[in-house]
Amino acid sequence: TNISSRQIQSIPSVSRSMNDVMLLTPQASSTTSGFAVGGGTYRGSSVTVDGAAFNNAFGIGQNLPAGGSPISLDAIEQMSINVTRFDGSQSGFQGGAINAVTKSGSNEWHASVYDYYTSEAFRGSKVAGEDVTNTKSLNHTIGATIGGPIVKNKLFFFVNGEYTFDTVPGSSSVARTSASEQWGSDVSANYPTVAQMDQMKEFLTSKFGYDPGRYQGYSLDTPDYKILARLDWNINDNNRLNVRFSHTHTYGSNQPSSSMSPLGGTNTALVAPDGTAISFNRYSAGRQAASALYYEAARYFQEQNFTSVAAELNSRIGKANNMARVTWSHQDEPRSYVGSFFPTVDILAQDNASGN
């Protein structure tokens, strides 16, 4: 399946990801982690841009690096999805081969400016008749492209830049205003009360000088940007060289880890101060369950940096054609936190541990 730039621009895509474009091939399917083809998994296929690998080397999360959107769709000239590849150069994977080619400059000048916007105003405030927390959120993407000649008929350039002002909601749950208020997974209120959360925050601030942050009704800024530059050089009638550089930086906010229960494994036998045995389950009474509530400082940020460089020399020697390609990709995903360093502390109340 071959997809042109015009088709790419006509596809409705909220995430502005290559995965949305890949779904145009009949054998494709969509998973929670990205594109799959021919009944395989999302890890089975290989994605390249100008011949450089654009796969998520980290091993978890999306099939593509940088949160699933490592390159702007406005920088792509065309894409191809090969379900049954036979080229020996396409090896090291079992699924389909997806390759995108970036735009290049020409003797004519071309430029574009684009803007995409969505916010919490586009969401409803009720589910099944119940009010839900509608915290401030924003996703505002602005970008531009420009391409043209540096030396006519000889040297051309293309540049794309994109910036996203992204504000994401924090915890969607709120504390109960009183101990008699209803709580649970079917309402927005969790078990802890406002008085309990405020009391603990005051204790941490006065005793240790540590501010754990907010626990409800807050949002976090997670901006990201993409840049791409490409040069095309017609060296002579027999040799053509193109070099492409791209870099993407995303910044995502995550809830505290729920892979472990606060005091042990999946099911842990605890003993309350009065000697009562308690069965603790991280799914029903863990850090993200309805029986708990966490402060803003318990969240963590996951930065996702992806850099790619590709250079290709096409030569004609007599009746023979030769292509030499060199690519380099680098993926870096450091973690950072809100506020100052402080140990992770889980506070387990006796009536809270059992989820009652």
Regions found by a protein language model. Give the residues of each.
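Periplasmic N-terminal accessory/gating domains of Gram-negative outer-membrane beta-barrel systems
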Residues: 1-104, 123-130, 139-148, 164-168
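Extracytoplasmic loops and strand-loop junctions of Gram-negative outer membrane beta-barrel proteins
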Residues: 3-4, 60-63, 80-82, 126-130, ...
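Outer-membrane beta-barrel proteins
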Residues: 10, 67, 86, 120-124, 130-134, 166-171, 216-217, 252-256, ...
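Membrane-embedded beta-strands that build the outer-membrane beta-barrel scaffold
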Residues: 37, 47, 81, 100, ...
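Substrate-binding clefts and substrate-entry loops adjacent to catalytic sites
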Residues: 119-136, 205-210
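Flexible glycine-rich, low-complexity coil/linker segments exposed to the extracellular/periplasmic environment
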Residues: 182-214, 277-283, 350-356
